[in-house]
Amino acid sequence: MPRRFSLKTRLLSLLLSAAMVLMFLPASAFAADDEQVRVGDAWLGSATRVVSCGEGGTAAYDPDTKTLTLTNVTINHDYNAAIWNTVEGLTIKLVGENSINSGDQTGILSMQGCGLLTLTGEGSLNITTADGQAIYANTGSLLIKDTTVTASTEAFDTCAVSADLGIEISGSTLESAIASGNAIYTPGDLKIENSNVTTSNDNQNNKGYPAIWSDGDITINGGQLKSTCKGGTALGAASTISITGCTLESASTGSNAIYTPGDLTIENSNVTTNSAGNLPAIWSDSDITINGGQLKSTCTGSDALGATGTLSITDCTVENKGYYTALYSGGKMTLTGGSITAEAEDNAILSRSAMTITNATVKATAQKYNALRASDVMKIDGGRVEATTFGENIYAIHMQPMDDGSNNGRMEIGGGVELYVKGFSGIFVGEEATIADAHIVIDSDDWSIDMPVKFADGYDIARALGGDSKGSAEPFDWYSMSLEPFTPGTPGTYRYLELLSGAKHTLRVTNGMISELNGKPYTGNEAEIPAGSPVTLTLTVNEDAFTAGEVFSSWTLFPTPRDLQIDGNVITFTMPAEDVEIRATGDIPPEPTPDAEGSPLFGLALGAVGGTLVGLTFYAAHEIGITQTLRETLPAGAAIPANRGELALLLWNAADKPEPEKQPAFTDVSDLETAKAAQWAIEAGLMETESSGKFAPAKRVTRLKVFRTWKAANH
């Protein structure tokens, strides 16, 4: 995709440079020991070890360690390389501020077969050339370690910094700029470790050279990298690119900001890319994997981020804006966790294969076409997804048939996802959509969703609203839409559609039966209800379930739904995400006690006996009178406690759940809230322990006991 500096052109240029160097060298230049490194016009070796370079500057060579120390040197040399190395394994140590101006020649040249060239030291080096390379290791490698180097050249068709066998930059600051060529180039691998690297390529001859290019792998760990390129790739490799823990900015005006035909891996990095041309800002001909960190990629003429193979993004904050797409993959696309904002002129997020979105926050916006588009299977599991399109006659979410015609795509939606869809049309599901637990809102101008839609095993519709708009939407029976048989192209019933589905849980009635469920006759004592469903029940008491002497007192629900309302035998609530037991509880009227006549309910009981409750014993009437008073006294919708645990919870909830002074340590209470309620009630003097270390939460309490305890709590 990108053009790099032609190897043939580069070799020809180097051969000509080498020929010029040889022309100016005397015959003695090839003496082995005395002439190892040339600095300007002076050879350094065993005999001559120090040469003055500029005002107060020195170049000192140690042949034993093969180290050339530059101390505040100024080298102006334009008829061959300013520093020409012939020794294997040379180290150049920088002390103070050093500068090299080599005119039309190479600044530092390490000749063929000299192996590793190392630049290091606490000082700095500034290399400028008019028409040559700044640093070149011929058939060798280059290490820039713990130092500062600036390299710039006005040359065309060459490289500012290059080494044939690989380049490593470690703990250093490197600035490299070129008029038209590669700022950094190696046929080997490029490794940048905890460094601050800045590169630029102006491509003044419009040949499209990359600013940074490796024919091998590029590995960047830590530090910062900023690369800009006019008309070429800003950062590219012929093999793979790995970026870890790095702050990276890469921009191109006519090509890719980042390109590789191999795999691209980005780990815990802050990456910003921009492409103003007609090629993707970030592109891999293979797979892209991004884990953690932040990514912001912009492209005005193509894709913001794309891979021919798979694309996997995990726990990353992504803000992409592209022309064709913000995210593209030819293979499977997986988006897990994190936050993804994707905007594009055409399709916001597009996979030519499957797409899986798991527990991610996704906001996808397309101006012309689809916000989300995939083939095979689109699975949205958990998280929050917003899909919006402004295109005419376009679906916001579209399942595209596979290129080989193997299927028309299908959708799976669940995990409690919140899915919001807006567009001319809502969702084209392909072959079908399977919904588990989800909250789906579709606001369309034409139709909301193409059928068929089914619910996964163990799940069902909890609530459905439909209408021409959100303002006119009303509840409706989902199964009245006559979903089967499916007719291709048949639209959804409503422009505005809101669905809430959930896992089905068991509603079980003990000591009674369901006679009516949500306005329809029902026979049985169990029902499977999806979580989130509004439930209205009419119940019938099974009097035969009570023991001799017991009378019905109240309906008790466990767990107690937050919006529970009880009106006689009619109960309403929203089904929680767990099973619910409804129990008809009865009580044995209390034995006569001396204070029975002193009960505040004594007159009420007598009235009951003299009125509609004729035939009951005095004490039964007394108990029913207490029950009636409790229903009027307790908070609306609260069940009358049947045991000590329920009584403690009633008192504790009414007091706004205060924390007890001591941690509960009951051996017979496993539920944390019940334990706290019991401990608090005992500390408040409203209840007592039953025995050492036990509270006996299941022990029955009479209505009279409930009434007295409730009044004792100043209610």
Where are these regions (language model features)?
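Feature responds to low-complexity, polar/acidic, surface-exposed segments characteristic
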Residues: 25, 29-31, 588-676, 683-704, ...
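Short, recurring structural edge motifs at helix starts
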Residues: 57, 79-81, 103-109, 131-132, ...
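Conserved "repeat-terminator" motif of extracellular CCP/Sushi domains
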Residues: 495-509, 567-596, 677, 709
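Extracellular modular ligand-binding repeats in secreted and cell-surface proteins
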Residues: 516-549, 575-578
